[in-house]
Amino acid sequence: ITAGAIGLLAATGNEQVEVGCRPGIGFVATGSELAEPTGKLKPGEIFESNRAMLASMSEKANGRPTLYPIVPDSLDSTVAAMEWAFAENDAVITSGGVSVGDHDHVKPAIEQLGGSLNFWRVAVKPGKPFVLGQIGGKPLFGLPGNPVSALVTYLLMVRPALLAMQGASKLGLAKRPGRLAKALANGGDRRHFVRVTIDDEGEVTSTAGQGSHMLGSLARANGLLDIPPNSRLAKGAEVGVILIDQ
């Protein structure tokens, strides 16, 4: 509720008003190769970054994030972690473990916990493996482990859902109009959300490397540009840039 809305409520004699609750969101990262970012790496390990990144973004959507310990690649560990997170939250967001490999346990964990699976793939790049399910009537969002894929799928599919849980009527992503500094093409069969920067004059530039593991180009970007499948956007084209910081 904004200050202006509070003033209007007071001026019209409304002492109490119904509001949507801020949802509690549990964040679970899976992967035996992951290490907490507070220690030292062992051979074959990488620091886990998705929980902190996504928790920060969820706070902008009025979520109340709780970060749970990293889960090793085993079905029993995944089931236990998800059960713990669901007991304490209104929704759970996992990262990693949503593909079809031997070490991907999120989908079988949903089944073991008596949940339902709505879908598990989306036609976007980055971010093809994405799980939407329910356990005990609460939503589970299973995001890819690659950081850029996790951010893109969060923005496109999780953020609107979190807002809807609070009764919000405006669920769309904020965009800024701009024009392309250089031509961009998408030769694939999925929508490609390219990391870009948009400056104060509205000039839109790709951040170069677009691999789903490249956090450096993500850190430089302030927006995403949706390029349809098998299409090319010419230099100077008028475009709408999805703002990342929302």
Describe each region flagged by the PLM.
Residues 46-51, 71-77, 120-129:
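A general structural motif
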Residues 109-246:
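Flexible glycine/proline-rich
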Residues 27, 58, 93, 196, ...:
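Residue-level signal for inorganic ion chemistry
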Residues 12-19, 43-45, 82-83, 120, ...:
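A generic local secondary-structure boundary/capping motif
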Residues 55-105, 109-114:
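N-terminal small/polar loop signature for handling phosphorylated ligands or for N-terminal nucleophile
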Residues 27-30, 94-95, 123, 143-144:
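Short beta-strand segments
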Residues 1-72, 224, 243-246:
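Short, glycine/charged-enriched hinge/interface segments at domain edges or termini
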